[in-house]
Amino acid sequence: MSSAPRRPASGADSLHTPEPESLSPGTPGFPEQEEDELRTLGVERFEEILQEAGSRGGEEPGRSYGEEDFEYHRQSSHHIHHPLSTHLPPDARRRKTPQGPGRKPRRRPGASPTGETPTIEEGEEDEEEASEAEGFRAPPQQPSPATTPSAVQFFLQEDEGAERKPERTSPSPPTQTPHQEAAPRASKGAQTGTLVEEMVAVASATAGGDDGGAAGRPLTKAQPGHRSYNLQERRRIGSMTGVEQALLPRVPTDESEAQTLATADLDLMKSHRFEDVPGVRRHLVRKNAKGSTQAAREGREPGPTPRARPRAPHKPHEVFVELNELLLDKNQEPQWRETARWIKFEEDVEEETERWGKPHVASLSFRSLLELRRTLAHGAVLLDLDQQTLPGVAHQVVEQMVISDQIKAEDRANVLRALLLKHSHPSDEKEFSFPRNISAGSLGSLLGHHHAQGTESDPHVTEPLIGGVPETRLEVDRERELPPPAPPAGITRSKSKHELKLLEKIPENAEATVVLVGCVEFLSRPTMAFVRLREAVELDAVLEVPVPVRFLFLLLGPSSANMDYHEIGRSISTLMSDKQFHEAAYLADERDDLLTAINAFLDCSVVLPPSEVQGEELLRSVAHFQRQMLKKREEQGRLLPPGAGLEPKSAQDKALLQMVEVAGAAEDDPLRRTGRPFGGLIRDVRRRYPHYLSDFRDALDPQCLAAVIFIYFAALSPAITFGGLLGEKTKDLIGVSELIMSTALQGVVFCLLGAQPLLVIGFSGPLLVFEEAFFSFCSSNELEYLVGRVWIGFWLVFLALLMVALEGSFLVRFVSRFTQEIFAFLISLIFIYETFYKLIKIFQEHPLHGCSGSNDSEAGSSSSSNMTWATTILVPDNSSASGQSGQEKPRGQPNTALLSLVLMAGTFFIAFFLRKFKNSRFFPGRIRRVIGDFGVPIAILIMVLVDYSIEDTYTQKLSVPSGFSVTAPDKRGWVINPLGEKTPFPVWMMVASLLPAVLVFILIFMETQITTLIISKKERMLQKGSGFHLDLLLIVAMGGICALFGLPWLAAATVRSVTHANALTVMSKAVAPGDKPKIQEVKEQRVTGLLVALLVGLSMVIGDLLRQIPLAVLFGIFLYMGVTSLNGIQFYERLHLLLMPPKHHPDVTYVKKVRTMRMHLFTALQLLCLALLWAVMSTAASLAFPFILILTVPLRMVVLTRIFTEREMKCLDANEAEPVFDECEGVDEYNEMPMPV
C-alpha cells in the first residue's frame, strides 16, 4: 500500500478528543446538554469526513499523519467487525446455534487464489444485526460515471488502500453514497431525520441498479435454494467491490424504528455498533495461513469447520484415470468423449476404428508439463470438496472460477452447462443391449432451457444453478423404450461384458480420476480447476466403468489460446497414474504440495532431443537411463522423512522393526541350522504338518482338477520316454513298467508325507546317465546289476539319515549357477548325443537299399521282410515288442530308417513349435496355453497315428508287458534277493557299494534341493513353507527301499515341479494392460500330486496303446528335452557371444558390467570343466562323473574368487532367474532354472 488509509473520525473519538475547529458553525450549543451536543457534533463530523473522503477519492496529497492516526489505525484494523450473516438465508440463521463457552472458536479457511481473504470469526450478535438491517438491502442502482462508488468509498482495514486493485477479494466495509454527500445540515432533529431518510432512499434507489458485472443480479439477498452459509460468499471480484460497499451503509437500525427514536438514541446505537469502544474487544480478523487453496464445504448445516474437526484420512489408493475431451458428436452437438485411459500405462482410442490401442508408456511434451504446472499455480484448487453428485461438484467448481476471476460472471451458466454435458465412451456402440443411460450431469441442456424460458434474471454468484438440498435426486423419464419396472434408486443398468472385463484389470478399491479438457469459444482465456473430493463417490455414467471418483481436473479455454488442451490433459493423466504423484495428491494440504510433486516428477523425467530415431536399438540407452533415474528416486524417497503411519519415525522404532524383520526372516529360513541332531527335520515337521488338513480342503477348486489332467500328461510322457530308453540301456532289466510303478508308488507316499507337495518326483536325465554307467560297470565285472542296486539303496538310506541328522541341507546354498549350468549343459548334450546316436544305429541296422541288384532276391527279401513286419505287428510277444533273447530283431528292413527319421523329426518339431505357440499371438490366451501345455502328448499322438497309417514299413515299438508285470519276466521278478539272484553277490561289493551310493546321493541331493529352492522362492508367495530335510529323507529312503523291488530311484524333477506350481498359481486378474501379471495365491495342497501319481500307476492298463508308440517318437521327445533345456542357461548364451562382435552384444548385466575378455575367460573356464566331465563320461570311469561335478563347487569358491573380482562374480554368477508367468514369446518354465530335465 502506498499510504495508510485515512482515519474516519467516529463518534467515540468525538466524545473523548473533540476538535473544535472542525465543528460546523451552524450547530447550536446548549451548556446544559453538553453530552448531546458532543454526540451531535460527532455525527456531523462523521458526515463531514465522508464528504471529504468522497471528494478526495480516498487519498489526500500532502496529508501528514500523526501518532493519533497510527494509534487509531491499529485499533480499528483489529476491532472493526463487519456483519456477515446478512447473506445467510432466514431458515439457516434460525438453525444456527451460538457457540458455547466451552467450545473452541471455529475457523474456516477462506483464502482467495491470491491468499488475501481473511478468515473471520462471527458470533450470534452479528446475525442479529444482519437480520435487523436486512430490510434496507435491495438490488443496487447503476451510478453515473461522475458519481461512481469508487469515488466515495473509504476503508477501515489495514490491508485496503486508497488505490484498490480489482482482484482484491477481502470483505469491503460500507461506503458513503453520493446521495448522502448532498444531504443538508440543519438542526439536530432535522439532521437525524434527514440522515435516516436518505439512507433509506439510498437502499431503495439502488434496488433497480446494476452491479457493473452482471446485470440485474441480486447481490445481497440470499436465494431460497441456498443450501448453506459459507464465509467465502463474502469474496467478490474487483468489479463488484464498490457496489457491495454502496449496499452496506452504516445504518444503525431499520426505518420504522429510527422514526420512533430520538437523535441521541440513534447516535448511541451508531456509536455502539460502528465505533471502536476502548476496553471492549471485538472479534479479531485473522489471516488465513494456508494460502490460496479453498477447502470448500458446501451443502450441509453450519457446523465445525475443517480445522476444528480432524480431516478424513486420505489413504492412497490405486488409480484409474480417464481422459474426456469436449468434441462434437454425429449430430454436431457437444459431448464429453473418452479419448484415453490409464490403469498403469496409456491406452488411446484410435480415431478411425473407435477401438482401444495397445498399452504404452505415455510420451509427453515438455511444454505441456510446464503449461500444466503454470495452470495449477494460478487456477482453482479445491481439496476435500464435500459433494456427492456431479452437478454439486460442477456448481462449486464454477463458483471458485468466478471468485478467482478465471471466468466472468456472465459465463457462469455456460461453463456449468458445458460441465454437465453427456459423456460417451468407445464401448457404447459395441453394446447391443439397451443404450447407456443419460447421466445426472447430462441434464445441463435441460437446465439451460429452463433458465432461458424463465423471467428471472441471472442467478447470484453464490446461487447454485440447481437449487435444493444435496439429498435431492433428479429423475428423468426417458423417451426410449425401457423395461416397465424402473429401479427405485434412480436410473441404473446392468454391467456389460466389456465393463466386466475392464473391471477385472482395475485393482480392487481403486479410485478414479476424471480429466475434462476442451475448447469453448465463449471464454476469453483458459480456466482450470483441480478437485479432490472428501469421499470417493460414483458419478452416474461419467466413467466407462462404475469406479468411485476421487479427483477431477477441468481445463476449458478458447481455441485462440496458445495451449494444447489435449496434451495438457494427457500430462495430468500421466501424472495421476504415477505412483509418487498420486500419493502426493492424496496427502496434499495446499497447492504448493501439488507443485512440489510436479517438480519431483520432472526431476525423474527424460527429455529426448528432436532427432529422428531410425531403430529401436538407438533407444536402448533411454531405458537404462530411466532405470537409473527411478533408482535414484527410490533412494531419495527412503531418505525423506517418513509419512505418518507409514514407517517408524524414531531411530529406536526403526531399529526395533529391523530386529523383528531379521528375527522373522531367520525363523522362516528352512535351511537355518539349529545345532541339534535332526533339528532341521523337527522344524520341518512343526512348520508343515499343522497345515495338513488344509492341504486337502484347499484342493476343492476347479483349477486343481485342470492341473491334475495337465500334470498327468506332463508326468506320463517322461516316464514313458525314460522308461523306453532305460530299457534299451539295461537290456529290459528296468523298463517302462518298472518306471511307471516306481513313479506311482513313490509319488503317493511323498504326496501324503512330504513337506512340499508341489514337488513332482520322477526320473531324470542325470539318473539315466548313472544307470547306464553302473550297468556297464556291472556287465564288465560280471556283477548282478539289480543286486548291486539293492546294496546301493541300503547305503543311500544311511547317507540320507546322516545328512539329515547333521542338517547338511544348507550345503545346497554353495551350489551356485556356475555348477548348475555345467550340470544342465552336460545333460542336454547327452540327450542330444543319444538321440542322434540311436538314429545312426537305426540307419546301420536298416540301411538304405540301392537301385541295383537282382529283382528276384529283392522280391524274396521284401517278402521275408513283410512277413517279419506282419509278425511284429500281429503277434504281441514277438522279438521286436518283447525283446526276448530267443528271437532276433528284424534287420535290413526297407524304409525303416527314413520313417524313423521322419517320426523323430516330426515329434521334435511339433512339440517344439507347440511350445512356441503357447506364447504366440494366435487364438485367445486360454486356448494357446492349453495347446502349448499339452504339446508333448499331442506330438506323440500325431506321430503314432502317422506310423499306424503306414502299414508296410517296420518300426521298432515300445516294449510294455501285459498287465502288472515286469518288463522281462524271464530275467527278473518283483523282489530282488540282496545276496544274489543267480550267483552269490561278493561281500567286498556290498561294502564297495558305498562309493556309487555317494555318487547317486550327490545327484539326488542336487536335483531335489535345487528344485525345492526354485519352488520356494519368495516371488512365488508360498504361505505354508517347505521342508528341505524331510523331503530329502523321504525321497532317498523311498529310493533305497524301492531298490529291493528292482524299481528305479527318483528325484524331484525340476521342470515338472515348476510346471506343477505354475498350474496351481492363481494370477491376479487386476493387472493393468501392459503390466506383468502378479501372483494372487498358490493352491498349496496334496490332492493334485496324489491323483497324478495314481493315474500314472493306472496307465499300465493302457499297455496295448503304449505298445503302439515307436521308439523313434521317444527319440524325438528326448531331443526336445535336450534342446529346450538349453534355454535359460547363461553359459549357452555366452557361448554365442564368443562368435559375435561386441557391438551386437545384448544389453544384459554381465555384458555391461564385465569387460569382454574377462567375460570370455569365465566362459572358457566353464567350457573346460564341461569338457573334463564329457571326457570322464566317455571312459570306463563314467560312474564317477557326479564326483567330478561336485568338485566344481570348491573350484568356484576358491579358484575363481582369486581370478575375478567380487563385482564380476556377482554379475557372471548371479541367480537372476525369476518365476515366469507372462506370455513373452519364447519364454516359459525352461527359462527359469538352469537345471537338467
From Swiss-Prot:
Residues 119-132 have a biased composition (Acidic residues). Inhibited by 4,4'-diisothiocyanatostilbene-2,2'-disulfonic acid (DIDS) and acetazolamide. Muscarinic receptor stimulation enhances activity through a Ca(2+)-dependent mechanism. Residues 1-238, 285-316, 445-466 are annotated as: Disordered. InterPro entries: Anion_exchange, Anion_exchange_2, Anion_exchange_CS, Band3_cytoplasmic_dom, HCO3_transpt-like_TM_dom, HCO3_transpt_euk, PTrfase/Anion_transptr. Residues 1-703, 915-929 are cytoplasmic. Keywords: Anion exchange, Antiport, Cell membrane, Differentiation, Glycoprotein, Ion transport, Lipoprotein, Membrane, Methylation, Palmitate, Phosphoprotein, Spermatogenesis, Transmembrane, Transmembrane helix, Transport. The modification Phosphoserine is found at S112, S131, S144, S170, S172, S239, S439. GO terms for molecular function: active monoatomic ion transmembrane transporter activity; chloride transmembrane transporter activity; chloride:bicarbonate antiporter activity. GO terms for cellular component: apical plasma membrane; basolateral plasma membrane; membrane. Pfam families: Band_3_cyto (PF07565), HCO3_cotransp (PF00955). A lipid is attached at C1169 (S-palmitoyl cysteine). Induction: Up-regulated during osteoclast differentiation. GO terms for biological process: amelogenesis; chloride transport; negative regulation of CD8-positive, alpha-beta T cell differentiation; negative regulation of CD8-positive, alpha-beta T cell proliferation; osteoclast differentiation; positive regulation of enamel mineralization; regulation of actin cytoskeleton organization; regulation of bone resorption. The chain crosses the membrane at residues 704-727, 733-770, 790-812, 822-843, 897-914, 930-950, 984-1006, 1032-1053, 1087-1132, 1159-1195. It catalyses: hydrogencarbonate(in) + chloride(out) = hydrogencarbonate(out) + chloride(in). This is Anion exchange protein 2. It comes from Mus musculus (Mouse). The gene is Slc4a2.
